[in-house]
């Protein structure tokens, strides 16, 4: 009888259906529950991504807090903002699902990092018949944002009489032509330099070659430097990621030769966020005046004293540039590379001194002192123009002419050097050097 029951095929469909209905319903229920869990996971990941990214954007609370920190650390404002963003991204239908969120927002070496981890426990519906009462959904989203480099530029501009030379070969030719007859009984004929004579009482000599240049439309080198600095302020304003990223101060070697003798820099502009105001101030960048020809034996170009002066102007630490409170200090030095100063000891000229007067390529020891402080030194070398028909040039400059550019490059922080010839544009060169500086990788250790 048992054998007949086993071999009997009638009613098998009903029996098999009864046997399979529970696993079939369980499988279908599992698919539905897992589908809901997958939907929840997708939504929570999207919320975590939004929170991780949104909490460290340039205008986020975390970025604002990081901007005030001179060092590294946790950004509590970023954590609060990330939490708000996360829960604002979840839908109401998921509101009954308990979700825990762990958030970390940190600043380290100028990089803001956020980590948003979530863990949710979703109750099941159909899977409960199989003994599974909940599904755990978890995940982590991370994001990073490198803050812009905050920089303070201290522009040190050589405005000494040698910067009164014609800006281009054509300007030099025009200047020589304009001075072909010389002055004061034929002295200083065919002069390429526009000396600016203003007496110690402030009375300007209208016949000085500075005014000859002006009256004949001759552009001198300091004019081009001043125009380049003004244009650079517009470029810097367009380049910065935020209004506070760059500050600029500008100095010349002195308004007068008397200032230079006293080692007193002329401050064109205080260190300022307002780059437009700095641009306006560039109108005060003029050729240094001298009270008379051969005043102080023409010893107005002391790179040593100018670099010492700018070193004194730069207060506090050199900075890493990671925040507004940790701004990187940069000297932007523009000069033609030939010093002419009273330096009876330590002159590097191969000809030595002449009665205490030292004409030499730049002595880089004061550049090194700035670099030893951690201050970056950017050098724009406005190539010294050879004047083969000038006795002073042939006697005192030509012996070290081949070293001028090399010494200027030695003064600069590696990679922060640019040379511009008389036929090149100083404005373009200054902009190129600036962009090179602001795009350089930030060293964090």
Task: Annotate each language-model stretch with its function.
Residues 21-35:
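Short, strongly hydrophobic transmembrane alpha-helices
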Residues 2-4, 10, 32-445:
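P/S/T/G-enriched low-complexity
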């Amino acid at each position: 009888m048992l054998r007949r029951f086993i071999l009997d095929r009638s009613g098998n469909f009903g029996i098999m259906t009864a046997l399979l209905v529970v696993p079939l319903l369980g499988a279908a229920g599992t698919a539905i529950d897992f589908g809901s869990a997958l939907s929840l996971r997708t939504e929570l990941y999207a919320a975590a991504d939004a929170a991780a990214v949104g909490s460290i954007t340039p205008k986020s609370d975390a970025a604002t807090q990081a901007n005030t920190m001179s060092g590294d650390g946790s950004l509590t404002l970023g954590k609060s903002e990330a939490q708000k963003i996360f829960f604002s991204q979840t839908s109401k239908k998921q509101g009954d699902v308990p979700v825990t969120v762990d958030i970390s927002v940190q600043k380290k070496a100028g990089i803001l990092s956020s980590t948003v981890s979530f863990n949710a426990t979703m109750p099941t519906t159909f899977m409960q018949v199989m003994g599974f009462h909940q599904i755990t959904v978890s995940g982590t989203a991370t994001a990073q944002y490198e803050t812009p480099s905050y920089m303070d530029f201290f522009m040190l501009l050589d405005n000494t009489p040698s910067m009164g030379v014609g800006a281009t070969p054509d300007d030099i030719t025009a200047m020589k032509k304009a001075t072909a007859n010389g002055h004061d009984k034929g002295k200083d004929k065919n002069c390429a330099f526009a000396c600016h004579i203003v007496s110690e009482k402030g009375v300007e000599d209208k016949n000085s070659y500075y005014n000859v240049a002006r009256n004949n439309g001759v552009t001198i080198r300091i004019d081009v430097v001043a125009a380049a600095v003004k244009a650079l302020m517009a470029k810097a304003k367009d380049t910065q990621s935020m209004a506070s990223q760059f500050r600029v101060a500008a100095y010349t070697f002195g308004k007068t030769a008397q200032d230079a003798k006293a080692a007193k820099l002329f401050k064109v502009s205080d260190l300022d966020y307002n780059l437009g105001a700095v641009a306006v101030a560039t109108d005060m960048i003029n050729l240094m005046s001298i009270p008379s020809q051969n005043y102080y034996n023409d010893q107005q170009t002391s790179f040593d004293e100018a670099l010492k002066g700018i070193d004194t102007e730069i207060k506090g630490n050199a900075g890493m540039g990671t925040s507004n409170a940790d701004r990187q200090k940069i000297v932007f030095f523009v000069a033609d590379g030939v010093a002419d100063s009273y330096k009876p000891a330590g002159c590097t000229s191969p000809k030595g001194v002449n009665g205490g007067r030292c004409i030499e390529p730049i002595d880089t020891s004061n550049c090194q002192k700035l670099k030893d402080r951690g201050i970056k030194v950017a050098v724009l070398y406005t190539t010294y123009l050879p004047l083969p028909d000038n006795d002073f040039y042939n006697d005192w400059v030509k012996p070290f002419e081949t070293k001028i550019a090399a010494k200027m490059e030695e003064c600069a922080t590696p990679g922060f050097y640019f040379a511009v010839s008389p036929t090149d544009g100083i404005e373009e060169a200054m902009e190129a050097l600036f962009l090179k500086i602001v795009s350089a990788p930030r060293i964090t250790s």
